Amino acid sequence: SLEVEILDGRRDPKGSLSQDQYTVHHRGHTSYDLIVVSVPQGRIAEAMADLHTGGIEGPVLLFCGFWGEREELDRLMAGRGVLLGYPVAGGSITRNRLACCVFDHVMLERRDKARFPGYERVEALFGSCGISLERPHDMLEWIWLHMAINAGVGAVAGMYGDVEDTTRTAVICAHGSSLML
């Protein structure tokens, strides 16, 4: 069983908090239309190995802050269809509890750059959930830039904020945009 706490920002920018308990059902098939993998960069190989070892087939929507080149990603994916995405929001799992948030959009690799069958079905899936898609010219470059900006913001927050009071630090950074210049 998995306890889920989600801050849903699709309709209200401040978010709506929901909590529920879900029963986890282990896979019943070996082939899927879509496998969503959301892991840190250093865990992609492990996730792909787990799918391979389990005999699980299907294209992967990879939500990951990947720093490498396309050739490295292709090697890690070992021939599996892959679509790069970035959820903009996020979360974490600790033991049997998922705490996360979702916004009204995600970043998704453009169709002409994706190595992914069924792109239209993924578009329809997000649309049915009230989540719009932003498609940068080059998804890998967008991820690199996003991660670099986050590192800069984190450095400034660490310099001017208080690691013991992250809420106050966020307010300082949000209202003191000149700190970021």
Predicted regions and their residues:
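Rossmann-like NAD(P)(H) cofactor-binding subdomain of soluble oxidoreductases
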Residues: 11-98
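Glycine-rich phosphate-binding loop and adjoining beta1-alpha1-beta2 segment
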Residues: 1-15
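Short, mixed-charge, low-aromatic patches
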Residues: 2-6, 26-29, 75-83, 132-141
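Long, contiguous hydrophobic alpha-helical segments, chiefly transmembrane helices and signal peptides
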Residues: 1, 41, 60-63, 86-91, ...
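Internal alpha-helical scaffold of NAD(P)-dependent oxidoreductase catalytic cores
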Residues: 54, 79-81, 99-181
